[in-house]
Amino acid sequence: MATELGRLGVWAWLDAYTAPEAAAFAKRLEDWGYGALWIPEAVGRDPFSLIGYLAAHTESLVFATGIANIYARDAMTLKAVHKTLSEIAPGRFVLGLGVSHEHLVTQVRGHDYKKPLSTMRAHLEAMEAALYMGKEPESD
């Protein structure tokens, strides 16, 4: 089932807000008719924890990572995150992944930055193959 993002969405870096302020912001977007809130990942809050919190404070707004860094979590963890948020907020979560930027991966995170396309492909294949023993969400 495809997630409906709506006609208008907002990309917002919310790390300057407290969690309750971010929830109020998300609720305002929802009330104003926005379809989606895209949340990036850099060196601040964990976007997935924040999305879980925001989803609990909204009813219809779709949340998407824009983007989450594949170097921050292994494939099994990302699969579990995707399944968990898809269960918590059915039809309201989009997992946007990326390879980030070389300096963030090598200098900030301490990983080797390899060929982006083949690295992403391998990560997605590993996610697909990863073990997940939790209850499957109704929409994924």
Label the model's feature ranges.
Residues 48-68, 72, 119-129:
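Alpha-helix-loop-beta-strand connector modules within alpha/beta enzyme cores
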Residues 22, 44-47, 71, 78, ...:
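Generic structural signal for well-ordered secondary structure
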Residues 19, 37, 68, 110-113:
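Active-site oxyanion-binding pockets that recognize sulfate/phosphate
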